[in-house]
Amino acid sequence: SVDIKTAKFNNYIDKLKAIVLIQIKIVDKYEDLITILLSQFWGTEQRNKKCQNLVYEYIGQIEKIVQEGIEKGEIKEGDTRAIASEIYGLICSTLVYKKREGENMDVMRLYHEYENTVINGLRVK
C-alpha cells in the first residue's frame, strides 16, 4: 500500500519520490502486467470498471499526499487531481521509455530524471 511505502518519510516531496521510484521498479519488473493493466483501463465492461476503480483509488492516495503537502507548504499550489494523475502517468512514460531502451534501462537514472523534472517542479522553493 502507498501508506506503508511512504510512512517512513517525514516530508511530502520524499513521499512522492518514493512513489515514483516504486512505480519505475514495478514497470521494470512487471512490464507485461502493467501493459495489461493499462489496456484494461479503457472500456465499459465490468473488468474495465474494476480496473478503473482500482486506478482511481491509487491516484486518490497520491492526491491525498499532494493535498497534505500543499497544506504543509511543501508542494506548490495546484490541482491535486491533475498532479496525482501526472504522477500516475509516469507509469506509462516509464513503459514507453523501457520499450525504447530495452534491457538498457537504468532504473536509478530514470528516477533521477523524473526527480529533476517532475518532482522538483512541485517543490516550494
What is the predicted function of each stretch?
Residues 26-29, 46-72, 81-85, 112:
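Amphipathic alpha-helical packing segments from all-alpha helical-bundle domains
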Residues 27-46, 96:
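Amphipathic alpha-helical segments used for helix-helix packing
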Residues 35-37, 50, 78, 99:
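Short, hydrophobic secondary-structure boundary micro-motifs
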